[in-house]
Each structure stands twice: as structure tokens, then as C-alpha cells.
Amino acid sequence: MIRFLCVFLIFNLFVRSSSAQQKRYNAAEIRLNLEKLNTLGSVLYVAAHPDDENTRLLSYYANEKHFRATYISMTRGDGGQNLIGSEQGELLGVIRTQELLAARRIDGAEQVFSRAVDFGYSKNPEETFSFWNKDSILADVVWAIRKVRPDIIVMRFPTTGEGGHGHHTASAILAVEAFKAAADPSRFPEQLKYVQTWQSERIFWNMFRPKEEEVKGKPDITGVDIGSFNYLLGKSYGELASESRSMHKSQGFGTARSRGKQLDYLKLIDGTPFLDNELSGINTTWNRVKGGEAIAADIQKIIASFSEVNPSNSIPALFELRKKINTEIKDDYWKNLKSKEVEELILACGGFYIEAFADISSVTPGEQIKITASVIHRSDQRFTLNDVRFNDQDSVLNSKLEQNI
């Protein structure tokens, strides 16, 4: 194992964690992520607080549909209750942020936030916006849409107040406004130095367990079976979602594993009408980008030849795939996203263990800290560790990594 030290100046007031590790995948999860490579789809889920999200729907889109699934929470939940400790306010927000991140590591979705502050219960959206700077929070939602480029947007709450909390209704109002604003170059043009405008195809409200007569025969409502079983994970999405939701420990959450068919309903709020389901007419294959057809064929070959007992056999083909994506795909969004996914798969197939940790948990500006990093690979492929970077510090190593050492 190669160990190295690096001393550098830290400019943050707080180091988030004294230890950092990459996620490690078993062979079935590697296979699942190989299949995700062949899907170019994105969904954004919008709500107000940690624990507002529908973890079943997020699990379904991330693992069944193989989408990039993202949850944007308007707040970090710092105005809520704490059932596991005495932390309140900002410190509770830190705890609930980590609970959300832990939930996403289980259900496979991504997590982002706006700058909105959870100031406690709010009677209506007007009161909420009197505390929040509406334009600033709207800019955050627009940024999220332009950043993750969702094909569809799903709101947890309606704009009409049935959510029972001003924050809930405000999150829906912001989502509907951002749906159009993200495609308008005159709205928040300062963002366009970094992202492009984006028009999602549709925006839906994720309905609250409606009665059959409320949804039957309605052309603007579609049902999604989120209870299907994933053989690679050995779990249904209801089971996966219950594990994810149980991460909200400060709120006393812990839900029983649900199994069997479960329908969630989506009501179209804006966007193009659909025929069969919420994704009708949306191309989520590599054909949506120029040069993608050949990439799809290469990925299919890698999947067909994948060995569960020796995933490292796929590494040479993954390196070639990464090179091909970077040279032949001109759409920067999908090129960067899929190239990163391939890099993560190479690390997973190589059995890499990468860890970095600091000797202290927090520092003040100008202080020095010692960072220790460890790298080990456990495959029969040959790797060289070229350099290690911490922020703007670069250590050139050019060291060969021996197997399992």
C-alpha cells in the first residue's frame, strides 16, 4: 500500500469530515452501473425539507429506469425537531444534511440544496416568501435544473396548499416557475457562463395516495409501479426505499419494508401531453447525442462479456470506452457525466480502496493540517498512480501499484 503525506493551507472554517472514502461496489452493483451507462435520462424531485422526498420513486428512477435521479431540498431542516440529541438550528441542519446524504447513498439518487433557511412552521407560502428571498431561491432551483438537465421534474407537493405547510407549497410554486425560467436566457443570465438553458419536457405533482375515482381515465394522470423487484440488488424498490428513509434518525423515522405492487400517481402540471406514461416520447438512449450509437454498442459488448467473478476483465474495454466518449461525444453534459461514471466503474472493477483523512476534525483559516491518503488496488490489472491532488496542491508520484499491497 502506498502512503503519502501532504501539508497545505485550508481556507474553510470547517472540514466536513476527518475521513473520506469512496463508495465500494459488489459485482451485482457493478453490473447495475454498467447498465446505467446505456441510459441518458434525468429526473429532478423537488420538495422543501429533508425527509419530504419520496424515496420509493427516487429508488425506482435511479435503479429501475437507470436515470440520473436528483432530489433538491429547499432547506436543510434546521427548523425541525431533534429526537436523537440536543442540537438545534444550524447544528441540526448539519445532522439532517448528513442524513439526506446517507439516504442517497442507499437509494442511488443525488442530493442538492437551495440556500433557503428552515425557520420553522409556516402557515402559507406568502409568509414563507417573506422570510426567504424568493428570487434567490428561484435562482437556486433554476441552477439545479440547468445543471442536471432533467427530462421531467416531479414535485412532492401541489401549489394549491394541500401540503399543510408554507414551505411545502412554496417549493411547488418555485418548481413551476423554474420549469419555464430555466429555459429563458433572460432569467439569471449570470448562470450561463457555467451552464446552458434547459427546458424539461414535463413537470408533475406526485399525488398523495388518491382514490381510484380521482385517477381513473384521467389523461393528465399516470401511475408508476414502484414496487417492482430488482434481482441485482435482491430487493424491491419499496424495501430499498424503507432503508433509505430510515436514515432520517433525528426525526424518528424508520419504516417497515414494503413489498409487492405499489402505484404512485403523477399529475401533469405543465409541459407536453403524454400518451402512455410520464416518459412518453422522451429519448433516453445514446441516440439522443451525436455519435452515441457506436458508444451504445460498445457498452452492450462490455455488459455481455462482464464476469461477476472477475470484474477486472472489463477494465481495458472501459478505458477504451472512456477515450471514445471523450473524443467522439460533443455534448459536454453527457460526455462529462458518462466519462465520470466510467471512471467510477474502472475503480470498482479494480477493487480500489482509496481513503484520505485529516489528523484533526476542524481548523481555522491559515492553519495547517496533515492529510494521509491510502491507495490499494486488488485486481490483476496494472495501474500507475501518477499524482495526488488536494485542492490546488499536486503531488507527482508516478508509482506503480502492486496488486493488493
For every predicted segment, state its role.
Residues M1-Q22:
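Bacterial Sec-dependent N-terminal signal peptides
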Residues A20-K147, T169, I173-K180, D184:
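Active-site rim/loop-helix segments in enzyme catalytic domains that contact anionic ligands
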Residues Q22, E29, A181-Y353:
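The feature marks non-catalytic terminal segments
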Residues A356-I360:
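Surface-exposed, proline-enriched loop/turn segments that connect beta strands in immunoglobulin-like
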Residues S361-E367:
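Short, solvent-exposed loop/linker segments at the N-terminal edge
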Residues I369-I371:
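Structural beta-strand segments of beta-rich domains
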Residues I376-Q381:
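Short solvent-exposed strand-capping/beta-turn motif centered on an Asx-Ser/Thr pair
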Residues R389-I405:
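Intrinsically disordered, low-complexity Pro/Gly/Ser/Thr-rich segments with frequent PxxP/GP/PP motifs
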